[in-house]
Amino acid sequence: MPWASGGFQFVKPPCRWDADRHRIYTMNESHRPSPKIDIVADGPYSVSGGLPLCEQWIVTNAEGESLEYREGKKYPVQPQYALCRCGQSGGKPFCDGTHETVQFDGTETASHQPYIDQAVTIEGATMLLTDQESLCAFARFCDPKGRIWNLVKETDRPEAQRLVKHEAGHCPAGRLVAWDRKTGQPLEPTFEPSLGLIEDTAKKVSGPIWVQGGVPVVSADGKAFEVRNRVTLCRCGRSTNKPFCDGTHAA
């Protein structure tokens, strides 16, 4: 059944491919709305623009260290859908209206200041690393091979350069960004606009929503957060830095 909140109405997505709805976009791509995520007050994430959605499983080594991502289940493409933010939906990852029953408090507490104004900088020989700790989603790609904060200081070595770029680029939250010291340019992975549902194999918990490719995230009050290549949104409902993940799901 559909539910209505704050002027929005959402319907639980069908369990099969909906060719007619998909065709709205494929017939005339020029009319396709730009991807966007609107936060509904004390409710879900309203996703528009036909953003692809799939599971992203963290792959670990024998020691449990995070190494790569493995793509899991892909969901049918839809023009608009609502993703659970309270963490208690019976139809995860989609919203089923449970937030109203449990009186979910989705108050946003995250700063709207630009990332670079909140991050600290660690200097290395050929690279820089910026770090905004409050964004940590506890994916732990920064830990292998001596930890990224130490590795960046060794970037006179090609292997250390490779590891820093890899580990920073795999940080789903964008807490960590590697920079070329000479050019001053960020060393960012290339993402198409899409959403990933992180699944943490080592911790056996579901992680945040991984927003990729510069998708705007707009507060319930209409104010947009800084558009970034990668951020993670809380989907357990318990983050103290809403709407962003703070790693509480793995605590």
Model-based region annotation:
Residues 92-103, 137-156, 166-183, 242-251:
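Iron-sulfur cluster-binding cysteine motifs and their immediate structural context
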